[in-house]
Amino acid sequence: MKNPIITITMENGGVIKAELYPEIAPNTVNNFIDLVNRGFYDGLIFHRVIPGFMIQGGCPEGTGMGGPGYSIKGEFTSNGFKNDLKHTKGVLSMARAMHPDSAGSQFFIMVADAPHLDGQYASFGKVIEGMEVADKIVAQKTDMYDRPYEDQVIKSVTVDLQGYEAKEPEIIED
């Protein structure tokens, strides 16, 4: 079976395509697909961009403090879940607070390798096309909070399931 493919279309026309890995982080993938299908990410920004590290988006408030109103269990090794997908350039992973089960909608795309994140965050996909778009986003001038002065707006995120049957995500109510 083929893996689902997401397409992130930026307001400026840039396109990032990524393959999701349900065999590595099934609930994380199901949650992401559910949010995509609800149009959750449409119009949001990459609010945190750090050269040599990653770009982060998926916060409805654009501050890094927001989420979907619930969280999901962290599917990563230090949280008792086997996940061997390394945080190398192009990998998608879920942002979270200190608590291991605090991820919701915020995600990041690695623009460089960050082995210190391996086993600590739920990696769940990888860019297969348009990595140069992420590289352009991370090169934007930012304020002291790593937020680009010019909003990097996600126009839409869509998913091609390619035969994958997404299930209702298991959530933890806030």
For each feature predicted by the language model, list its residue ranges.
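Cyclophilin-like peptidyl-prolyl cis-trans isomerases
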Residues: M1-D174
